[in-house]
């Protein structure tokens, strides 16, 4: 699918997808393009697109470079998969002849939000670099919202976990905690990747003054968000360690109970084993009260360590 946008009265407006209109486009957003759509861009604009396999490369030389096809940036965008788990999607940005090409394999919240804003928001410079930086700025705003949501969730989780009561809510809190840790790690990766992309853009291009200041402002926003995200990692680790501590304490209580029970019944078992041998020369076997005596001895053997443990405060 090709979404083409041109400038009209300093605003982005969507245009038709035929070749004539594509020549006037300043931004072409390609969402899972078909082979036919790739050929349209190649024949009409002379622009070849990266494959989705190339978007998975993580080395800097494969994500940020410039060649005869233009300036290329591959950047991560935060999203959620079909099961509402945190995920990252790679988007390819290419700027050539004053035109921005974006290639992605799924719908992304940052792109959807920017398209909505562009209906009423005017562009200052009306160039492809401004559109690129506006998309990055929208992405950072989304990441800031994600961090704020994690903060709010961790406040609720901390009340459940630090309460120490291991019930269904405690188990659910542990599951949510692991999800928040995964989300926070993806936010950190996205921030770092965006920082590298903007650094490359500032170094390798002659941005207009307004766009240069905009890029630096986004970099400052990233630097301000990174400590917040790092503190989230620390809080998640603290809550995880606290939860593991409570679980270990509960397990120790259970093991302590079984250890005491086994020690209590060990003397009684010894008595039962002794009289269970049934040798004829055991005088108690022919004693009228031998059986009650053995039972009483077993009870006394079990109660003696129990009373001793209670006095020692071990129970």
From Swiss-Prot:
<feature type="transmembrane region" description="Helical">
    <location>
        <begin position="289"/>
        <end position="309"/>
    </location>
</feature>
<dbReference type="InterPro" id="IPR045861">
    <property type="entry name" value="CorA_cytoplasmic_dom"/>
</dbReference>
<keyword id="KW-0813">Transport</keyword>
<feature type="transmembrane region" description="Helical">
    <location>
        <begin position="257"/>
        <end position="277"/>
    </location>
</feature>
<dbReference type="InterPro" id="IPR045863">
    <property type="entry name" value="CorA_TM1_TM2"/>
</dbReference>
<dbReference type="InterPro" id="IPR050829">
    <property type="entry name" value="CorA_MIT"/>
</dbReference>
<dbReference type="GO" id="GO:0005886">
    <property type="term" value="C:plasma membrane"/>
</dbReference>
<dbReference type="Pfam" id="PF01544">
    <property type="entry name" value="CorA"/>
</dbReference>
<dbReference type="InterPro" id="IPR002523">
    <property type="entry name" value="MgTranspt_CorA/ZnTranspt_ZntB"/>
</dbReference>
<dbReference type="GO" id="GO:0015099">
    <property type="term" value="F:nickel cation transmembrane transporter activity"/>
</dbReference>
<keyword id="KW-0406">Ion transport</keyword>
<comment type="function">
    <text>Mediates influx of magnesium ions. Alternates between open and closed states. Activated by low cytoplasmic Mg(2+) levels. Inactive when cytoplasmic Mg(2+) levels are high.</text>
</comment>
<comment type="subunit">
    <text>Homopentamer. In the absence of Mg(2+), interactions between subunits are weakened, and dimers, trimers and tetramers can be observed in vitro.</text>
</comment>
<keyword id="KW-1133">Transmembrane helix</keyword>
<dbReference type="InterPro" id="IPR004488">
    <property type="entry name" value="Mg/Co-transport_prot_CorA"/>
</dbReference>
<keyword id="KW-1003">Cell membrane</keyword>
<feature type="site" description="Essential for ion permeation">
    <location>
        <position position="252"/>
    </location>
</feature>
<keyword id="KW-0812">Transmembrane</keyword>
<keyword id="KW-0472">Membrane</keyword>
<keyword id="KW-0460">Magnesium</keyword>
<comment type="similarity">
    <text>Belongs to the CorA metal ion transporter (MIT) (TC 1.A.35) family.</text>
</comment>
<protein>
    <recommendedName>
        <fullName>Magnesium transport protein CorA</fullName>
    </recommendedName>
</protein>
<dbReference type="GO" id="GO:0015087">
    <property type="term" value="F:cobalt ion transmembrane transporter activity"/>
</dbReference>
<keyword id="KW-0997">Cell inner membrane</keyword>
<feature type="short sequence motif" description="Probable selectivity filter">
    <location>
        <begin position="276"/>
        <end position="278"/>
    </location>
</feature>
<dbReference type="GO" id="GO:0015095">
    <property type="term" value="F:magnesium ion transmembrane transporter activity"/>
</dbReference>
């Amino acid at each position: 699918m090709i979404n083409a946008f041109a400038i009209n009265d300093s605003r982005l407006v969507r245009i038709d997808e035929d070749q004539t209109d594509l020549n006037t486009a300043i931004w072409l957003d390609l969402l899972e393009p078909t082979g036919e759509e790739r050929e349209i861009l190649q024949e009409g604009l002379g622009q070849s697109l990266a494959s989705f396999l190339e978007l998975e490369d993580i080395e800097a030389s494969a994500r940020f470079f410039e060649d005869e096809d233009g300036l290329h940036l591959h950047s991560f965008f935060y999203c959620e998969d079909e099961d509402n788990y945190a995920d990252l999607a790679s988007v390819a940005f290419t700027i050539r002849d004053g035109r921005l090409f974006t290639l992605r394999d799924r719908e992304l919240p940052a792109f959807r939000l920017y398209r909505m804003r562009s209906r009423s928001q005017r562009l200052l410079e009306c160039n492809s670099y401004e559109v690129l930086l506006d998309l990055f700025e929208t992405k950072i705003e989304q990441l800031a919202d994600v961090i704020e949501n994690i903060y709010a969730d961790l406040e609720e989780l901390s009340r459940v976990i630090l309460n120490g009561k291991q019930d269904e809510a405690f188990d659910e809190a542990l599951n949510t905690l692991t999800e928040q840790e995964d989300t926070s790690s993806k936010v950190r990766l996205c921030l770092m990747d965006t920082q590298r992309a903007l650094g490359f853009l500032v170094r390798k291009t002659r941005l207009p003054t307004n766009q240069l200041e905009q890029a630096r402002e986004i970099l400052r926003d990233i630097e301000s968000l990174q400590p917040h995200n790092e503190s989230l990692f620390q809080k998640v680790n603290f809550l995880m360690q606290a939860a593991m501590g409570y679980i270990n304490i509960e397990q120790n209580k259970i093991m302590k109970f079984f250890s005491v029970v086994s020690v209590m019944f060990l003397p009684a078992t010894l008595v039962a084993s002794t009289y269970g041998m049934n040798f004829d020369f055991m005088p108690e076997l022919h004693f009228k009260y031998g059986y009650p005596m053995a039972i009483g001895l077993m009870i006394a053997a079990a109660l003696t360590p129990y009373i001793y443990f209670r006095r020692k405060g071990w129970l």
